[in-house]
A protein has these predicted regions:
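Class I SAM-dependent methyltransferase SAM/SAH-binding core
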Residues: 48-99
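A short SAM/SAH-binding and catalytic strip from SAM-dependent methyltransferases
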Residues: 109-122
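A short glycine-rich, Lys/Arg-flanked "PGG" loop and its adjoining helix->strand segment in the class I
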Residues: 123-135
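Glycine-centered, small-residue-biased loops immediately flanking beta-strands
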Residues: 45, 137
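A short acidic, Gly/Pro-enriched loop at the edge of an enzyme's catalytic core
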Residues: 98-109
Length: 209
């Protein structure tokens, strides 16, 4: 069986449109996410964001924490993020979720938003996230939900996206997503579905020792 290919080429091409698309289709949900993240983040925390894109989340949660390492595997996304007027406590860098370069137990919290379903190996990504989290560290992992729209609509959108170079490797209902996170070393603490063009499942979980 051929190895699954990642979406890096797509994201490199898409970097210039990323902020516009998020605002257009998920803007209100993202504003609610920032507020919800602020409920649990604190000024003493060092936070890693995986799949930061152009840094939208990092920029909006930086005031809640001590430091944010904001990473993405797309160099073009990181270039776009670095062009922003970002708070001084954010560092942007290119990193692959499957082979994170950070030392074990470094971060109080890890944020990975709308990314696990588009990764060829989300289990490996979660294992790396768990490795760099402190004991009982916080995982914040919002993800677009499959269960709130029809299979035909989802499949039609997926086919169109694949034609332009984007592939979805996993599709989960909210219950399936909770089960997936739980099977990979985390205990889900909070779950809420936010309205967006694709409904957004906001999830917080704690690393299980």
């Amino acid at each position: 069986m051929p190895e699954k290919q990642d979406n890096k080429g797509f994201w490199n091409r898409y970097a210039k449109l990323y902020d516009f698309e998020i605002k257009q289709f998920s803007g209100k949900a993202y504003l609610e996410m920032y507020r919800m993240m602020g409920d649990y983040l604190s000024p003493d925390m060092t936070v890693l964001e995986v799949a930061t894109g152009t840094g939208l989340i990092a920029v909006n949660i930086a005031a809640y924490v001590r430091h944010v390492e904001a990473t993405d595997f797309s160099p073009k996304m990181i270039e776009a993020a670095r062009r922003k007027k970002a708070p001084a406590n954010i560092k942007f860098s290119v990193e692959d979720a499957a082979v994170l370069s950070f030392e074990d137990g470094l971060f109080d919290a890890v944020i990975i938003s709308n990314a696990l379903h588009i990764m060829p190996d989300p289990v490996k990504a979660l294992a790396n996230i768990s490795r760099v989290l402190k004991p009982k560290g916080l995982l914040i992992a919002p993800s677009y939900s499959h269960g709130h729209i029809s299979n035909s609509t989802w499949n039609l959108n997926a086919k169109f996206l694949k034609l332009i170079g984007f592939e979805t490797f996993s599709k989960w209902t909210p219950d399936e997503y909770v089960a997936f996170i739980g099977q990979n070393g985390f205990q889900v603490k909070r779950l809420q579905v936010l309205r967006a063009a694709f409904p957004l499942v906001y999830l917080e979980a704690q690393k299980v020792e």
